[in-house]
């Protein structure tokens, strides 16, 4: 891995780092996650997100390298969609942690899920390993979507909580 490799791995981590630095007091909704018996602890969530962002960055590096590197036209669709989903992923963090808006966060996650699934199909002919590296991301988005949905539902109907 040349110098570009660590850059591709590190860039996805910049968003969460900046968001955490800017958010002085996270939403109280984060504490609500503990009410869900199947929700992982906060440290596990943090570890999984850091791992997924790093793996996602490495996968994008593989695609970039496979298509010849640089900033050429063949990279526009695969890495353009990747950049868009990365921005959506960072937006989810803002909506969920800072804006205290589980409904918008859920909508963001649904769009993100579709984009990541599209990336798997687009990246598969380019680099199979890169596409496979996105599958744990899809699995984690499923868990995150379930948690966010539950928090959104409970915020709409607080008396319906089991």
From Swiss-Prot:
Keywords of this entry: Cell membrane, Endoplasmic reticulum, Membrane, Receptor, Transmembrane, Transmembrane helix, Transport
Bilayer disposition of the protein: Multi-pass membrane protein
Tissue spec. comment: Expressed in liver, bone marrow and spleen. In spleen, detected in red pulp but not in white pulp.
Signal sequence annotation: none
GO cellular component labels: endoplasmic reticulum; endoplasmic reticulum membrane; plasma membrane
Subcellular location: Endoplasmic reticulum membrane; Cell membrane
Stretches that traverse the bilayer: 3-23, 44-64, 79-99, 103-123, 129-149
GO MF terms held by the record: 5-aminolevulinic acid transmembrane transporter activity; cholesterol binding
Record-level GO BP terms: 5-aminolevulinic acid import across plasma membrane; enucleate erythrocyte differentiation; import across plasma membrane; intracellular cholesterol transport; lipid droplet organization
Predominant place of localization: endoplasmic reticulum
UniProt-listed InterPro entries: TspO/MBR-related_sf, TspO_MBR
Null allele phenotype: Decreases erythrocyte count and increases reticulocyte count. Abnormal erythroblast cytokinesis and differentiation. Decreases hemoglobin levels in maturing erythroid cells.
Domain of life where this protein originates: Eukaryota
Subunit structure: Homotetramer. May also form homodimer.
Family: Belongs to the TspO/BZRP family.
Domain remarks in the Swiss-Prot or TrEMBL record: The C-terminal region mediates cholesterol-binding.
Task of the protein: Cholesterol-binding protein involved in the redistribution of cholesterol from lipid droplets to the endoplasmic reticulum. Required to meet cholesterol demands during erythropoietic differentiation. May play a role in transport processes at the plasma membrane of erythrocytes, including regulating VDAC-mediated ATP export, and import of the heme precursors protoporphyrin IX and 5-aminolevulinic acid.
Name of protein: Translocator protein 2
Species of provenance: Mus musculus (Mouse)
